[in-house]
């Protein structure tokens, strides 16, 4: 039920960028520019910053082509080695360079050729632990080198390797072995494929070779073309021993990315009418697939498609010529979460090795740096409008489920709406009766009414399309948030970070302006009378977003930037709750817990899950020092409850006294926690709604003494009302027998 939301985005114009990688020590991007047909010079650049990007030249040198057959040399691998603080650059002509920067004295960098391969290099890649470099030469040999560039092993890729994995075939699927008489189709075994692939080449076969390591560095996979045979994926151990070779797959292309968790390798299979991402196991056998799609147009028009898993195996990036797609998987369904336009032609994408959702993408004209977070697009949890609204993005489709009406597990949903391009973000308006969908072509406004206490299908009320002048090629919409009955759009354009306000039914062209500060995250707070929006900058300062007065600094703040945060008001005092990437949850600047995985705010509670598989309830207070976090003892403390391993909060419905949890696989569970039920019963007693309070006491097995003990004087003064609301004599007997 989670979407991807942007928290950082920046562009840097730079010509002829050929490769990029991350320096995790400084969170900076290293990239190479050149060589080109006009110049054989290579520049090593260091890109700093997130929104305001600067470029520093680290080193430059001349790298002419070593052979007349290669007109222009090419960078086939770029890697920053943290252990030695050097940058390794591998060129197609066969040279391997290292660049040692002098970061302390600021002197000239040391550039050295540490090795050269006469046959030329098709591709190369360092292992995740930076201990081994795998080089595939143009003579079809695989060379494994140590960290000091000494050869560890050398093997030759031959047609005999295809016999390494003895995939058994007894002719199933071939015409000669199939019964073709009457009723043959009905009798066919569904586990047997209708057609057995022979390894026919793709229509866009480019003869490229790709290397991908498993996350633990124990195995490396090489996707290459075996002349006279087919394209094959070979898996080698760290010692250079052949472990397996893939089965024949028609239309398999040159890209390959091994999921760091190790269970699957992803490749591209081009079929006559579609393009699939095909998955392989380590033994070379197929293990499922999904079909690529894009609201921007048919994906079959793209000649070369590349794949890159992020470091924690949660997101698969699909890189096209002018587009990056981010895909996630839940409940065995693949969701298209984001489409990011880039300048053609894209040259590479590099995920940050430690911050899993940060990446750098390069094209021939610029470098893009972005970062996303997983977040749940939920509506207000303020009764009586807490319908449990949650929206899930899947390309141009928005899947909506009001959990107060129905608990429908993903990938299904109660309602589905479609927009004209890939959705970027969703924001719910006041009382959850309106919402806006931000996509690359504009903003769609919807009315979401309720009928007889149940949510009905949303109705499109207005479309606000972006003008060409407003969203030129460099403009990228990032986020949207509700401010009262308006919606504020945040985007990245040529002049920097900009925002504007939009309103349903208003077709006037708004003015995109630069705010006083760059907001990396936004949230909303709704009480009975208004809907307020708040933002957070990179320093952890909190600001109120207003239409008339712009950004207003709040007296409370975090000590650093929190990717996830919510605002609550207790007795008129603002309390901010924030969650860091390492699981620390804060109330203003006070640390509450160090093992939080998700949290939700209701009018009375802070609810959060922990990596010890508990869900905890903290009663809100205006003084953050008075907030009491329960210990891990669900048997003695009703504010702590055990949950399934890996559960995360989706939303809370105080009116139903329930929370919705999502398991790691993707299935949902509705839980009625004791702390929430008791708080809800107390609220019903305060409202003199004894019928519902009694009903919840029965169904949730709460001691009925609470009906009297919570408000004794009120109960004695309203005995007649109590009897009128509960006319059943057996219920009265049950209540009287429970009194102590």
Protein language model annotation of sequence segments:
Residues 218, 222-225, 270, 622, ...:
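Alpha-helical repeat scaffolds in large eukaryotic proteins
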Residues 642-644, 650-654, 659-671:
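Canonical SH2 domain fold
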Residues 656-665, 717-740:
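A cross-kingdom feature marking charged/low-complexity
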Residues 693-697, 731-732:
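Solenoid-repeat scaffolds in large eukaryotic assemblies
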């Amino acid at each position: 039920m989670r979407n991807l939301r942007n928290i950082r985005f920046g562009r840097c114009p730079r010509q002829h960028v050929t490769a990029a990688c991350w320096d995790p020590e400084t969170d900076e991007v290293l990239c190479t520019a050149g060589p080109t047909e006009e110049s054989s010079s290579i520049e090593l650049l260091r890109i700093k910053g997130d929104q305001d990007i600067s470029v520093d030249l680290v080193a430059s040198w001349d790298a002419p082509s070593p052979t007349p057959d290669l007109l222009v040399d090419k960078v086939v691998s770029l890697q920053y080695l943290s252990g030695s603080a050097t940058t390794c650059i591998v060129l197609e002509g066969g040279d391997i360079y290292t660049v040692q920067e002098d970061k302390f004295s600021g002197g000239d960098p040391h550039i050295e050729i540490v090795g050269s391969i006469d046959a030329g290099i098709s591709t190369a890649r360092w292992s995740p632990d930076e201990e081994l470099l795998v080089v595939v030469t143009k003579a079809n040999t695989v060379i494994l080198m140590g960290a000091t560039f000494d050869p560890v092993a050398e093997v030759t890729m031959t047609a005999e390797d295809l016999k390494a994995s003895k995939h058994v075939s007894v002719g199933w699927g071939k015409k000669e072995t199939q019964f073709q008489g009457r009723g043959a189709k009905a009798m066919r075994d569904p586990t047997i494929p209708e057609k057995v692939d022979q390894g026919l080449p793709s229509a866009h076969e480019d003869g490229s070779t790709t290397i991908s390591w498993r996350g633990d560095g124990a195995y490396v996979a090489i996707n290459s073309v075996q002349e006279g045979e087919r394209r094959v994926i070979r898996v080698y151990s760290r010692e250079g021993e052949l472990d397996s070779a893939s089965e024949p797959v028609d239309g398999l292309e040159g890209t390959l990315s091994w999921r760091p968790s190790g269970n699957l390798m992803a490749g591209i299979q081009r079929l006559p009418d579609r393009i699939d991402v095909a998955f392989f196991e380590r033994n070379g056998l197929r293990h499922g697939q999904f079909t690529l799609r894009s609201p921007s147009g048919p994906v079959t028009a793209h000649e070369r498609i590349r794949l890159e898993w992020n470091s924690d195996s949660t997101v698969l990036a699909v890189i096209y010529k002018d587009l990056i797609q981010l895909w996630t998987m839940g409940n065995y369904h693949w969701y298209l979460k984001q489409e990011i336009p880039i300048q053609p032609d894209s040259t590479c994408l590099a995920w940050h090795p430690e911050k899993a959702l940060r990446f750098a993408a390069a094209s021939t004209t610029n470098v893009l740096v972005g970062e996303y977070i997983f977040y749940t697009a939920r509506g207000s949890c303020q009764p009586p409008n807490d319908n449990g609204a949650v929206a899930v993005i899947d390309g141009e489709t928005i899947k909506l489920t009001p959990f107060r009406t129905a608990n429908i597990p993903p990938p299904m949903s109660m309602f589905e709406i479609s927009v004209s391009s890939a959705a970027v973000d969703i924001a719910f308006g006041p009382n959850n009766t309106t919402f806006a969908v931000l996509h690359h072509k504009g903003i769609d406004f919807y009315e979401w009414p309720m009928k007889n206490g149940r949510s009905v299908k949303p109705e499109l009320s207005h479309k606000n399309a972006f003008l060409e002048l407003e969203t030129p090629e460099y403009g990228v919409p990032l986020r949207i948030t509700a401010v009262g009955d308006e919606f504020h759009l945040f985007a990245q354009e040529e002049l920097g970070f900009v925002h504007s306000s939009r309103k349903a039914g208003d077709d006037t062209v708004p003015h995109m302006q630069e705010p006083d500060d760059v907001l990396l995250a936004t949230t909303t707070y709704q009480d009975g009378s208004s809907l307020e929006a708040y933002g957070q900058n990179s320093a952890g300062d909190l600001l109120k977003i207003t239409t008339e007065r712009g950004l207003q600094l709040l007296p409370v703040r975090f000590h650093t930037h929190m990717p996830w945060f919510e605002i609550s008001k207790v007795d008129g005092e603002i309390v901010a709750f924030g969650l860091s990437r390492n699981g620390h949850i804060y109330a203003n600047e006070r640390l509450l817990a160090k093992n939080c995985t998700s949290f939700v705010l209701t009018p009375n509670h802070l609810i959060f899950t922990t990596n010890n598989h508990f869900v905890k309830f903290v009663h809100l207070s205006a003084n953050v020092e008075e907030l009491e976090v329960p210990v891990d003892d669900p048997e003695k403390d009703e504010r702590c409850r055990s949950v399934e391993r890996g559960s995360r909060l989706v939303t809370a419905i105080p009116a139903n006294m329930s929370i919705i949890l999502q398991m790691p696989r993707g299935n949902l569970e509705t839980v009625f926690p004791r702390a929430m039920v008791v708080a809800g019963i107390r609220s019903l007693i305060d409202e003199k709604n004894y019928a519902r309070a009694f009903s919840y006491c029965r169904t949730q097995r709460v001691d009925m003494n609470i009906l009297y003990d919570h408000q004794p004087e009120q109960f004695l003064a309203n005995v007649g009302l109590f009897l009128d609301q509960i006319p059943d004599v057996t219920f009265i007997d049950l209540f009287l027998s429970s009194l102590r």
